[in-house]
């Protein structure tokens, strides 16, 4: 997990103070299966998605952000000038604050607000720390490792049996499709990339 620039208002707040503060988790799977992985922002949506809506002149759904006056807005330009909101209200806000603390002050680095102040309008990438925890299941489980890994697979199978999908399943499917068919991008992005290539 890591902070970013301060682009997100805390639950009940009206101006940016927190970062999008992504959180990721990975779990190995046997027999050559891709790992169980999720990686998501603690904001209602990633800032990049707001930027894509802005580029395509598309409104954003209610609940993604507020304008600089703290009013809910569906205008991506207003939200980019205001603040994103956390996902899940106070729960998402609490997770975001936790990430600020453990990947900022706890490791001797900046918070998202401090990163944005340090940037001083330069528009550079966030200046932040990262906290990565890696655990070796064999150290916890020893000779029972395979039994417990099988229990994890049972959990995954039970989720899929209900018609739900695992986080990252869609990503793996999209990756396979892209490897076969290439990528598709909006015409507006193609035009922008073409323009940049001519510079």
Question: At which residue positions do the language-model features occur?
Answer:
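Glycine-rich beta-alpha junction loops
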Residues: 42-45, 91, 137-139
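Structural motif
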Residues: 15, 22-24, 34-37, 62-65, ...
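Phosphate/diphosphate-binding glycine-rich loops and adjacent basic-rich segments that engage nucleotide
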Residues: 7-76
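Short, acidic/small-residue loops that bind anionic groups at enzyme active sites
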Residues: 1-5
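Catalytic-core signal marking the mid-to-C-terminal active-site face
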Residues: 106, 111-199
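Short, contiguous, pocket-lining structural segments
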Residues: 13, 17, 30, 79, ...
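Small-residue-enriched flexible segments
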Residues: 46-108, 125
């Amino acid at each position: 997990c890591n902070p970013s620039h301060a682009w997100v208002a805390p639950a009940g707040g009206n101006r940016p103070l927190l970062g999008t503060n992504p959180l990721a988790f990975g779990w190995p799977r046997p027999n050559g299966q891709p790992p169980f992985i999720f990686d998501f922002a603690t904001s209602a949506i990633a800032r990049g998605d707001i930027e894509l809506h802005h580029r395509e002149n598309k409104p954003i759904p209610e609940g993604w952000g507020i304008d600089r006056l703290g009013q809910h807005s569906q205008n991506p330009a207003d939200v980019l000038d205001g603040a994103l909101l956390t996902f899940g209200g106070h729960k998402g806000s609490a997770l975001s604050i936790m990430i600020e603390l453990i990947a900022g002050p706890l490791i001797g680095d900046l918070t998202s607000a401090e990163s944005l102040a340090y940037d001083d309008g330069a528009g550079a990438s966030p200046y932040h720390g990262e906290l990565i925890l890696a655990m070796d299941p064999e150290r916890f489980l020893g000779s029972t490792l395979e039994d417990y890994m099988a229990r994890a697979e049972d959990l995954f199978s039970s989720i899929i049996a209900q018609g739900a999908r695992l986080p990252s399943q869609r990503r793996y499917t999209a990756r396979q499709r892209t490897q076969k068919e290439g990528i598709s991008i909006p015409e507006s992005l193609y035009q922008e990339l073409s323009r940049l290539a001519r510079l």
